[in-house]
Amino acid sequence: MFKFVMVFAVLGVAAAGVAHVPHPQVSHPVGRSEDVHAEVKSEHSDVRADGFDADLLVSNSIQQASSGDVHGNIHGSFSWISPEGEHVEIKYVADENGYQPVGAVLPTPPPIPEAIARAVAWLEAHPQAPEPVHHSHH
């Protein structure tokens, strides 16, 4: 019983010590000074039985627009001015294939090597027949 009490006492002290560890304050410079006082310049939303349309314009040049249909497909875009002063825009589709963003600032995968592309095309043109399943009775 004494060991049992000691184990829980040690665990309690350890947990209390972890709870009082100070967390350093980290400053994250984000955005621009005018972002702090940004105001909504226009906002519109129209929700209907067959879908919706919505858009937003903020005084610091942030914009958002989207529309959706009754099947859950959404098309939209959002944009802002980067800290470097560049206009950044992302267009997207969200549907049964997932979220598909497109924009110049997004990374793109390298091209598929020609040999791999030929191999994939050959495999698609020559599908393998399923192998028969053999059951052995013992």
Swiss-Prot record:
Effect of mutating residue 129 to V: In strain: 0101.3, 0101.4, 0101.5, 0101.7, 0101.9, MSH22, MA28, MA32, MSH38, SP138, SP235 and SP295
Outcome (variant: residue 47 to I): In strain: 0101.3, 0101.4, 0101.5, 0101.7, 0101.9, MSH22, MA28, MA32, MSH38, SP138, SP235 and SP295
InterPro entries: CHIT_BIND_RR_consensus, Cuticle_Struct_Prot, Insect_cuticle
Keywords per UniProt: Cuticle, Signal
UniProt domain Chitin-binding type R&R: residue ranges: 49-110
GO cellular component labels: chitin-based extracellular matrix
Domain of life from the UniProt record: Eukaryota
Entry annotated with the keyword Signal: yes
GO molecular function: structural constituent of chitin-based larval cuticle
Signal sequence annotation: 1-16
Keyword Signal: yes
Function statement: Component of the larval cuticle.
Name of the protein in question: Larval cuticle protein 1
The organism of origin for this protein: Drosophila miranda
Gene from which the chain derives: Lcp1
